[in-house]
């Protein structure tokens, strides 16, 4: 169990949270492994529909689990009868996050910023060629399967709409 919340949103949402371990390179199942951060917000009704709502974040780069409390009010009616499933795509949130910048970096000049961004890939604990929309949507389908859902509904905004189209 976990509680999803944001300082700027009044909602505190109870969820079931966990991780799914997947290979960073899907072609090498016994290679380097990464964790996908997952939260399932169970339907309010005891007679939930069998097809949950998977919510996809914008960005790319947003953590859906982190921002969900802010968008929950628009999904409240659907939540009455459907589980809501949140998966931080690889490289976002707590799913092997890809971060090079920190709060102090906002004070860098242009040359320093360019140098920092150019050195970023070598500093990351990731092989970036496996952090694509196609692979992230294969991860999403693996989450669907592991959770036992045969069909799902997708909801995305901004980049999440592109990700949803890739999934379909």
Where are these regions (language model features)?
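Gly/Pro-rich cap/lid or specificity-loop segments adjacent to the active site
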Residues: 1-168
